[in-house]
A protein has these predicted regions:
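Positively charged n-region of N-terminal signal peptides that target proteins for export
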Residues: 1-6
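Bacterial N-terminal signal peptides
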Residues: 7-16
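Flexible, solvent-exposed loop/hinge segments and secondary-structure transition points
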Residues: 20-148, 152-156, 160-177
Length: 177
């Protein structure tokens, strides 16, 4: 009987060691909306990217589109609120981007961070680098986006995600003139 218990304990310990040590929800969707667009009214929209739009976004941004269904809200008076996910090193990072009426980044908020390390991507100074960026901006580490030592993959993947969302705005959301 004792031997059986020991054999059950070892797999349980190993399973616990492979689980992420930290998963933190910082903001709900409503809290992120309030942080980016205080006092504004937002209307959730149902938008699904077509196959052609997905291909064009991938070609333009250089980033794979994982989901065709967009999580987007249109802001009364102009602008967009978009919730997206990217992979950090091993786990998803959920973030929100607010875009102005002309498609510039208004603000970036990290909503859920599930990695053990690299939470510095939540630092306001680092996130401020994205403000004003539009479609066509490089959004590359050590170029127009400063890398965070110890959070390189999270930094890179968030920059890639924002670049993809800017391409999504340009190719699928921007009002036609």
């Amino acid at each position: 009987m004792r031997t059986t218990i020991h054999w059950m304990v070892v797999p349980a310990l190993v399973a616990g060691a492979t689980c992420p040590a930290r998963a933190v929800t910082y903001l709900s969707i409503e809290q992120a909306q309030q942080a980016i667009f205080p006092q504004a009214r937002l209307h959730q929209l149902e938008r699904t990217l077509t196959s052609d739009q997905r291909k064009a976004i991938e070609k333009t941004s250089g980033v794979k589109v994982r989901a065709a269904q967009l999580k987007i809200w249109q802001v009364e008076g102009g602008g967009w609120f978009i919730v997206d996910e990217v992979i950090g090193k091993h786990e998803f990072i959920t973030y929100a981007v607010g875009l102005t009426a002309d498609g510039a980044v208004k603000q970036l908020e990290v909503m859920d961070y599930r990695e053990t390390y690299g939470g510095q991507v939540r630092d306001e100074k680092w996130r401020a680098q994205f403000i004003g960026k539009k479609h066509g901006a490089k959004l590359k580490l050590d170029d127009d986006i400063q890398n965070i030592s110890g959070a390189t993959l999270s930094s890179r993947h968030l920059a890639d995600g924002v670049r993809r969302l800017l391409a999504t705005y340009e190719l699928a959301l921007k009002p036609k003139a």
